[in-house]
Amino acid sequence: MADFEVLGQTVGTNRFFVIGGPCVIENRDMTLRIAEFLRNACARLHIPCVFKSSYDKANRTSIHSYRGPGIEEGLAILSEVRREIGIPVLTDVHGVSEVAPAKEVVDILQVPAFLARQTDLVVAVGLTGKPVNLKKAQFLAPRDMSLVIEKVRGTGNDKILVTERGTQFGYNNLVVDMRSIPILSESGCPVVFDATHSVQLPGGQGTRSGGERRYVAALACAAVAAGAHGVFLEMHEDPDRALCDGPNSLPLEQVSPLLEKLLDIHRIVRDTYGAQDADIERKTGREH
């Protein structure tokens, strides 16, 4: 599997890593505070981390919902996070025209789940040569993502993360099939589990989406046990007052205890199954 380096941190399959931050940029000061919190929490545990936030949420449920500061102001804030806090940044792009300005600022470009089938966008992101995070669409089977990954690889870009974020289950609900973790791993890409969007209740509160925050930890633990290489966690200083995705975002005080637990699970999985894989390679003569 392809590991890659972003701003001095290795993201891939060898070390557990975290992508985290508020769903959307609400203001500069809060964004910097949460980025600093994430950096410090991960540094204490020696976990590579990437800060994520959006300058625009183009798929909000209601026309009246807050979307973000916009691309110009948002990228300026993300640039400040990268420069002042010193951690790599990730943001999502919603159209081909956004790719060029975003690539000048961020370390990883993300294709949103709803846009995973938009070939022009996927190819444009791949052509930047930047690392790409492909989020599995809620309406796609895990194996279908191999075709999305192929579009990026076709540009010559092999720095790809693929993220599981749940599957539509009837109306206003998502469910996670943990088989998707090993299935997505067959692609050769590091697999991320989006533990917070996976508990979202899309459109579940009428004019906005709901969420079941209490299940974030359980699903994150299950995903890492199933072989996820990293987790994606949205977090906020006051989730109940967040302007986007509050019901499924973690309060900051819950982040470090969860990361400690996930790191322990990851070590067990790595030490147990990594040793088994090496033993199989030795017995079959495939070890070099």
UniProtKB/Swiss-Prot annotation:
It comes from Syntrophobacter fumaroxidans (strain DSM 10017 / MPOB). This is 2-dehydro-3-deoxyphosphooctonate aldolase. Belongs to the KdsA family. It is an enzyme of class 2 (transferase). The keyword Protein transport does not apply. It comes from the Bacteria. GO terms for molecular function: 3-deoxy-8-phosphooctulonate synthase activity. NCBIfam families: KDO8P_synth, PRK05198.1. InterPro entries: Aldolase_TIM, DAHP1/KDSA, KDO8P_synthase. Keywords: Cytoplasm, Lipopolysaccharide biosynthesis, Transferase. It is found in: Cytoplasm. One of its GO terms (cellular component) is cytoplasm. Pathway: Carbohydrate biosynthesis; 3-deoxy-D-manno-octulosonate biosynthesis; 3-deoxy-D-manno-octulosonate from D-ribulose 5-phosphate: step 2/3; Bacterial outer membrane biogenesis; lipopolysaccharide biosynthesis. Its EC number is 2.5.1.55. The keyword Transferase applies. Its main location: cytoplasm. It catalyses: D-arabinose 5-phosphate + phosphoenolpyruvate + H2O = 3-deoxy-alpha-D-manno-2-octulosonate-8-phosphate + phosphate. One of its GO terms (biological process) is keto-3-deoxy-D-manno-octulosonic acid biosynthetic process.
